[in-house]
Amino acid sequence: MQKNQTIFLNTWKFLITLHQKPWSTFFTKIPDFPHVLLKDIAKVGVGLVSGFDEAFLLNEDDISKLNEDEKQLIKNFVKAKNCKRFVVEGFVQYILIEDNLKDEEIFKTKYPNIYKKLLKFKDRMENRYLPKNKKWFNWQALRNYKFLIKNLNKKRIYVPTLDRKPYNRFSLGDDELLPSGDVIFIQPYNDDDIYFLLGYLNSSFFRNYYLANGGRRGGRVAFTQKLLENAKIPTFSDEVKEKIKNIVKDIIYNLKNGKDIENLERQIDYIIVSAINNNQFKGYQTTLKNLLKPKLKG
């Protein structure tokens, strides 16, 4: 047996253990590997914060009362509870009032039913922390809003900002979705990277790398913009990335059809560790400039 095969088999035994001990930081001393930072190949950002979800949340009865102008303010949001690991299930609907709406009389006239709904919460909404240029009916923080709207037709990866689950819940959402304040979004600059990233970020390898690099918050894992932006993403060969991509597609298919995915997840871990031990990386002739293309709008 070759030396690198011995290293791999020993590491594979540890991977089996890590499935049973998901809070382990075994990889604290893992040797460095050829990589790019996640921020070099994807936009990583925080979600939109209303500051008072109860007021902006819509149910079917609310929606039935809205006029056509008011329906244009309805947006579909991904919350932490919708992140099921690999896939987003469902969404919640909120009234989203953009910051350029400042005149309360215009608001009241053009959106009477929404105005009436929000008016019930006015006193409490005024007690939110709001920048001086915002009105009581505005959202608290529309961070990354222009970027998100410009790229609303693209799929994104979402992950809860805080999680007690013993596994990562990076989840792929369809287009026309926005991130709420309790999730982080990841938008690859190259659409082809989305399935590879989804597989890698949900792997046991990445979970333990992330925990070892500051992601632990007591009994929870904290996925922050800063930590994720600076996470190392291996520059695997195209062959390795394609294998992971295809397995992730199989995982999503199985999840949508009520089938088990455990063996497929273990295959991803196997491929990642094997690729690192056997130096299956792209040549260094690939420049960062090329990795950053094509850039998204915004």
From Swiss-Prot:
InterPro entries: N4_N6_ade-DNA_methylase, Restrct_endonuc_typeI_TRD_sf
SUPFAM superfamilies assigned to the protein according to its UniProt record, in alphabetical order: DNA methylase specificity domain (SSF116734)
Catalytic activity annotation: a 2'-deoxyadenosine in DNA + S-adenosyl-L-methionine = an N(6)-methyl-2'-deoxyadenosine in DNA + S-adenosyl-L-homocysteine + H(+)
Keywords from the UniProt entry: DNA-binding, Methyltransferase, Restriction system, Transferase
Keyword Transmembrane on entry: no
GO molecular function: DNA binding; site-specific DNA-methyltransferase (adenine-specific) activity
Gene3D superfamilies recorded: DNA methylase specificity domains (3.90.220.20)
UniProt keyword annotation of Metal-binding present: no
EC number: 2.1.1.72
Protein name, as recorded: Type II methyltransferase M.MjaIV
Source organism of the structure: Methanocaldococcus jannaschii (strain ATCC 43067 / DSM 2661 / JAL-1 / JCM 10045 / NBRC 100440) (Methanococcus jannaschii)
Gene that encodes it: mjaIVMP
